[in-house]
Amino acid sequence: TAEERGLLGSKYYTDYDPLVPINNTIANLNMDMMGRADPERGVRNLNYVYIIGSDVLSDDLHEINIDANKYSNLELDFRFNGIDHPDQFYYRSDHFHFIKNNIPAIFYFSGVHEDYHEPTDTAEKILYEPYKRRVKLIFHTAWELANSKERIKLK
């Protein structure tokens, strides 16, 4: 979605051509850079995912995500969650344009690596087992959102 040039795809989607009208959009679950390992963690502990923004606009979204983790048993790591974090990950992926439109969002992320935004970031470097567990968490979060009788509340 052209995030390397200012998140243009998500901006276009939210501002001009949403598949689902923005006022009917419940949440955005953004998966970006989830298939690798954070070098700080190494390959010893791959059973994690960084969670960014889940509690900014909705406590309900945050709690649904935590509850959905019973199916994947990941370490939900919130170290980058702060909107004032020096790395500014909260502002650096496609979920941000949804948040700007008052749509709660979660940015799922496994960390920056040496191939970040480089042509060397290729499919054979994906770590599929931890990726599968991360996707399982997102699936169950989405399932709960889609099947809930009530819309999640905004703060």
Each language-model region and where it sits:
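His/Asp/Glu-rich mid-to-C-terminal helical/loop segments that flank catalytic regions of hydrolases
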Residues: 109-155
